[in-house]
Swiss-Prot record:
The keyword NAD does not apply. Residues 552-611 form the KH domain. Its cofactor is Mg(2+). GO terms for cellular component: cytosol. It is found in: Cytoplasm. Involved in mRNA degradation. Catalyzes the phosphorolysis of single-stranded polyribonucleotides processively in the 3'- to 5'-direction. It comes from Clostridium perfringens (strain SM101 / Type A). It comes from the Bacteria. Residues 621-689 form the S1 motif domain. Disulfide bonds: none annotated. SMART domains: KH, S1. This is Polyribonucleotide nucleotidyltransferase. CDD domains: KH-I_PNPase, RNase_PH_PNPase_1, RNase_PH_PNPase_2, S1_PNPase. Belongs to the polyribonucleotide nucleotidyltransferase family.
């Protein structure tokens, strides 16, 4: 049976259809916002998965190019692996939903959001979060807390709910807020140095606007939601929990109070070995339960240490940042390098400058077609002292790379100011918490070292949270290390400059964040960020005055768009000859802006000279140094500009009478000529006699 429900959000219709499509899924809905439509299917396994200690939720965000009326590029002509944007959107759906499933739920759950129609005014990624929550709430899967998502823009001093395509272009803020009725579940933001109080007000605005969508979901559930199944929740048997606690709690507490990371890990390894030795014969089939009990006790100790004892595992104050180290210019042949160290977290970022033609072309459903600034993040196993095969970037690496990219994007100079493609690669050399924000700092150092005139230096910091079980007690921590991230309840990453925030990403393991926590985290991050920026400025106070000698040399020139065909030539003949002769790369925009780049500056100068010659107009009355290309009985043909030839009649070759043209000039001679006329057919008439006369008069005057 087909059910529909509809509401109005920000002046546009939001509609859900349930029961019409995907009849064999637990729940399948078609959710639309304007003309953007998402098909969402959710399913769960009948039984919990055995032998695991985590919740096996998978979220897939599937882009279909037919949704924007495109046929995929390439030979195969069908969608391939998910784009980076699709991976990021899948992560954004997962993060607010995961903490709201029942604790101990071990059934496999899959959420598939397929983008089937896109209207640029209504972003599919925002609708997909709402659709995933709606489908889960309507299904029989034990998910009962609706989550809503909105985007908030900022034009002038006015917040805009779900801005249109045009409004997004004008907006200085791109903020996504996900919330339940009571608390904020997730924040994603990018902005043009947004002040802290403005960002907090924008988050409040987004939270309030989420309530209408939550109400819409609740109405749909009350009208046609399925009855919820009673889940089989995993719980560590009391007997095992008590036995492990009695045997190991004191040892765990003592080990977790060791401030040195390596000593603490060694002590915990010893404790775990003793636990295994004690219980592996008694409970051979429950070793995962024993591991879970140990984890719970470790978390209990850390929570007590922070909330009751007022101590952090490494002895720092709650608002204290670890020791900072900054260095530039490490690698001799790269265009720019930055090494950033914070405690045991260390990231080396390398900047590479390329020609404008090396931009990344994006073949997706978004409005963005290309990128000239990109950031890639690598997290090898050795960064945590482990051994595992090296593979391509996973979802986490792609997410962290995009986060650091967003943090610096508003600070990158325009194409006109700095005609280069910019690629940053952050290599995580050592990881003990907040490598994504360390890569923001490393990126700033690398850009400054590469001579990129960024607007201002940026830095990032990760704030953490520890709460009591009932959420009545909470403490915000500055610069969380690995242990605090692992056992903590929040990862609140903030990057920005002295002027304001450029990016935020917030994940939580609990059922949302209070207004106070958000306020304390944002202002705590500012204090830490300013301290880190001071360290960066001590290392390199401003961008290098010149780019590296190993970076390509570039030049730009503006030509008449009508002359583009003259530079390209028939079948690319002219431009290919320029490239072959000078060894440059040439990129021509539709508005006539030409970028020329090469490893050698001489090649750039030569190519620019040729292009200027090809596009320059011959003007009547001007004097040119031309080259004789052909001789006839009646005169000499002279090339005054590339592909621009005129005739010097025999009577205009010299002041005296000329019997034979060859008596005055030969093919290949360079002579001064004056343009006396350009006739109605575009033919150029030249005079050597007039040019000589003018030159003599100038000499007399001098």
């Amino acid at each position: 049976m087909n059910h529909t429900h509809e509401t109005i959000i920000a002046g546009r219709p939001m509609k859900v259809e349930f029961g019409k499509l995907g009849m064999l899924s637990d729940a399948a809905i078609l959710m639309s916002y304007g003309d953007t439509v998402i098909l969402t299917n959710v399913n769960a396994s009948e039984k919990p998965r055995e032998g695991i200690d985590f919740f096996p939720l998978s979220v897939e965000y599937e882009e279909r190019l037919y949704s924007v009326g495109k046929i995929p590029g390439g030979f195969i002509k069908r969608e391939g692996k998910p784009s980076e944007k699709a991976i990021l959107n899948g992560r954004a759906i997962d993060r607010p939903l995961r903490p709201l499933f029942p604790k101990g739920y071990r059934n496999d759950v899959q959420v598939v959001c397929t983008v089937v129609s896109v209207e640029n005014d209504n972003l599919p990624e925002i609708l997909a979060i709402n659709a995933a929550s709606m489908a889960l709430c309507l299904s029989s899967i034990p998910f009962t807390t609706p989550v809503a998502a909105v985007q908030v823009g900022l034009i002038g001093e006015e917040f805009i709910l779900n801005p249109t395509s045009k409004e997004r272009e004008e907006s200085s803020l791109q903020l996504t807020v996900c919330a339940t009725k009571e608390r904020v579940m997730m924040i994603e933001a990018g902005g043009d140095e947004i002040p802290e109080d403005t960002m907090i007000n924008a988050i409040k605005f987004g939270f309030d606007k989420c309530q209408d969508i939550i109400k819409f979901q609740e109405e749909a559930v009350s009208m046609f939601g399925k009855e919820k199944k009673v889940p089989e929740l995993h719980k560590v048997p009391e007997e095992i929990e008590e036995a492990v606690r009695e045997f190991a709690f004191d040892m765990i507490s003592e080990s977790m109070h060791i401030t040195d990371r390596d000593e603490r890990n060694a002590a915990m390894d010893e404790v775990k070995a003793k636990i295994n030795e004690e219980f592996e014969e008694k409970y051979p089939d429950n070793m995962s339960d024993i591991g879970e009990a140990v984890y719970d006790m470790q978390k209990e100790v850390v929570r007590h240490m922070l909330l009751k004892e007022g101590k952090r595992p490494d002895g720092r104050a709650f608002d204290e940042v670890r020791n900072i180290g900054c260095e530039v210019g490490l690698l001799p042949r790269t265009h720019g390098t930055g090494l950033f160290t914070r405690g045991l977290t260390q990231v080396m970022t390398v900047a590479t400058l390329g020609a404008i033609s090396e931009i990344q072309i994006l073949d997706g459903i978004g409005e963005e077609e290309s990128k000239r600034y990109m950031h890639h993040y690598n997290f090898p196993a050795y960064s945590v002292g482990e051994v595992r095969p090296l593979r391509g970037p996973g979802r986490r690496e792609i997410g962290h790379g995009a986060l650091a990219e967003r943090a610096l994007e508003p600070l990158i100079p325009s194409e006109a100011e700095f005609p280069y493609t910019i690629r940053l690669v952050s290599e995580v050399l050592s990881s003990n918490g907040s490598t994504s924000q360390a890569s923001v700092c490393g990126s700033t150092l690398a850009l400054l070292d590469a001579g990129v005139p960024i607007k201002r230096p940026a830095a990032g910091i990760a704030m953490g949270l520890i709460t009591s079980k009932d959420l009545t007690e909470e403490e915000v921590l500055t610069d969380i290390q690995g242990l605090e991230d692992f056992f903590g309840d929040m990862d609140f990453k903030v990057a920005g400059t002295e002027e304001g925030i450029t990016s935020i990403q917030v994940d939580t393991k609990i059922k949302g964040l209070s207004e106070k926590v958000i306020h304390d985290a944002i202002y705590g991050a500012r204090k830490a960020r300013l301290m880190i920026l001071d360290k960066i400025k001590e290392c390199i106070p401003a961008p290098r005055e010149e780019v590296s000698k190993y970076a390509p040399k570039t030049s730009t020139l503006q030509i008449d768009p009508e002359k583009i065909r003259d530079v390209i030539g028939a079948g690319g003949k002219v431009i290919n000859k320029i490239i072959a002769d000078t060894g440059v790369k040439i990129d021509i925009k539709e508005d006539g802006l030409v970028y020329v780049s090469s490893a050698e500056s001489e090649g750039v100068k030569e190519a620019v000279k040729i292009i200027e010659g090809l596009t320059k107009e011959v003007k009547s009355g001007e004097i040119y140094l031309g080259k004789v290309t052909k001789i006839a009985q009646f005169g000499a043909f002279v090339e005054v500009l590339p592909n621009k030839e005129g005739l010097v009649h025999i009577s205009k070759l010299d002041n005296k009478r000329v019997e034979k043209v060859e008596d005055i000039v030969s093919v290949g001679d360079e002579i001064l000529v004056k343009v006396t006329e350009i006739d109605s057919q575009g033919r150029i008439n030249l005079s050597r006699k007039d040019a000589i006369k003018e030159a003599e008069e100038e000499n007399k005057q001098q």
